[in-house]
């Protein structure tokens, strides 16, 4: 396994503010910052590759729904929805401390009732942890079960993530970022590493000179420490394996679009509009027309369903409706 560049390891997650939405409730916006003096997203190819990664990552976080995000040179803004606040970590640690310090007699009806209640609480807590935070939750539960000591609960969390409320929105985002921010550093639930799907389509749809330079740079960043030729070979193999299609086929499909009078590099805007009367932020992201056929295949493969027709702008003259494609399908059609 190649050594991964440490620039992708986040430094902290910070809650910026929350804004209200009539139908969705309170939506917190977070900022995930990276290491000091590190600006990994200045490179456009690296920045674009994380668009696909965030869509993919939040697809299996059942308790955390990604509303929108904006990527800056050295930090990421996230607007998310979470389930109601679950059990704080302090309460879990307190229950276990009581169980450890007090001698409970299973033969005593009162003690037996307390033991049953504690077991139920911990079982529900374990299920909730796995549901809300997905692979990260399963990793954390394994950490706790391996120690079997209530004293390490809070210290482990505080030392690693700087937060004491295990399942709060901030803690969940911080944990997700730490464990799964780097696509090649962690493989969620047996899935292959997250390939740079949109970066791949953007690179091979761009002008040849910029495409080749961007691909070499991306390969060097992901497969840090390898020679350039070996890094390119590994990246191409990973892309072909994950997307299930060869780069030559994508080149051919884009050439067919050009022959039919379409520009595969023409940008269109996908947007999200929460219709908040107070004027909540509207983030924008760009697509190229040539991406939509690939995007439908990708959506069917990873989300289990094709992209909804009313969620994708396929207009060539710019007069069509467009909306951000997301796992939750959030977005309102609007004229671009």
Regions found by a protein language model. Name each.
Residues 1-73, 81-336:
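Short Pro-Cys-Gly-centered "Cys-loop" motif that presents a nucleophilic cysteine in a tight turn
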